[in-house]
């Protein structure tokens, strides 16, 4: 599968990005877990500081074997000169030394339950009134089940578009 075909299948749509930007607002600090080629990363960085976290590892999800070859280079070129701080790491590794409160977290990384359990630990750094967003809701059963069981009972849903769901803390 070519990179273009794989990307078109999994990427955020313009409507999803528009909703996410509207829910976040401007002049915020946002952690993005899972950046791929940086389309959403750059869109969010137009009016915010984005902390992008992606290890660029192949095959973390056995149901979705998107090859990451070349993706990291595209990402690096795309983010150059923008208000983006990039960590080539797993989110749990960055979290170990994290100390700054953030305005929101956007989770679109490894969709396996173990990884989701690690990624949601970032919610502890989201300020009250901040946002918690997930991509691939109603697309990846692991994401849907996780969100319905662990997020829905605790937070207020404020937006949904295609595979994006956004919550207020």
What kind of feature is each model-predicted range?
Residues 3-7, 14-169:
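S-adenosylmethionine/decaboxylated-SAM
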């Amino acid at each position: 599968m070519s990179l273009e075909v794989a990307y078109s299948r999994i990427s955020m749509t313009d409507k999803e990005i528009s909703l996410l930007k509207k829910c976040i607002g401007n002049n915020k600090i946002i952690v993005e877990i899972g950046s791929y080629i940086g389309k959403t990363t750059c869109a969010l960085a137009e009016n915010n500081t984005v902390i992008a976290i992606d290890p660029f590892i192949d095959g973390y999800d056995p149901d979705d074997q998107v090859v990451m070859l070349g993706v990291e280079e595209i990402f690096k070129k795309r983010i150059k000169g923008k208000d983006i701080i990039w960590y080539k790491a797993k989110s749990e590794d960055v979290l170990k030394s994290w100390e700054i409160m953030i305005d929101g977290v956007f989770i679109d990384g490894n969709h396996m339950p173990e990884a989701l359990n690690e990624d949601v630990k970032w919610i502890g750094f989201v300020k009250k009134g901040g946002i918690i967003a997930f991509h691939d809701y109603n697309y990846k059963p692991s994401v849907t089940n996780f969100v319905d069981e662990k997020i829905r009972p605790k937070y207020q849903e404020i937006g949904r578009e295609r595979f994006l769901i956004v919550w207020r803390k």
